[in-house]
Amino acid sequence: VLIDSKYKNAMLVTPVRKFQDQYYVEYDRNDVLTNCSTNKNALHYGGEMVGIHKLSRSFFRKMCEDYASQIQTSPKLGYEFELLRISRMMMPLHVVMDNDVHWYEIDDEKDLIFAKKHVAKYC
């Protein structure tokens, strides 16, 4: 989906399906990322970040340069919020919604068991 996207800078987003570690995303009518949060009540979310992105070299460079300038004052700044900073201030990051992607983040064996039972059947 991202490879075929017309956007040079895009993030894959799905409808909210998970119950752990979500990053909710908000985007405008042009599909440009405008906000993200782990708290779904903090924004008008349109989906959930999967963690797969297509970034141009120039976007990635700006992101790395900006992150380097922020690390001293914001040492726990996650890449999700760095993507948001760049999208808001420098270059738009477009949201590509895919309703057919079924996924699950696996952090431990318990997650793996859950994924095998509930997600693998869609593969």
What are these regions (language model features)?
Residues 1-29:
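Conserved beta-loop-beta/alpha segment of the NTase-like Rossmann-fold superfamily
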Residues 19, 60-62, 111-113:
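Short, acidic Gly/Pro/Ser/Thr-rich loop/turn segments
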Residues 21-23, 103-108:
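Short, solvent-exposed polar/charged micro-motifs at secondary-structure junctions
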Residues 26-28, 54-55, 106-107:
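Short beta-strand-to-turn element immediately C-terminal to the catalytic PLP-Schiff-base lysine
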Residues 32-102, 118-123:
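Catalytic-core segments of class I nucleotidyltransferases/pyrophosphorylases
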Residues 107-123:
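Short, basic/aromatic-enriched C-terminal tail that caps enzymatic domains
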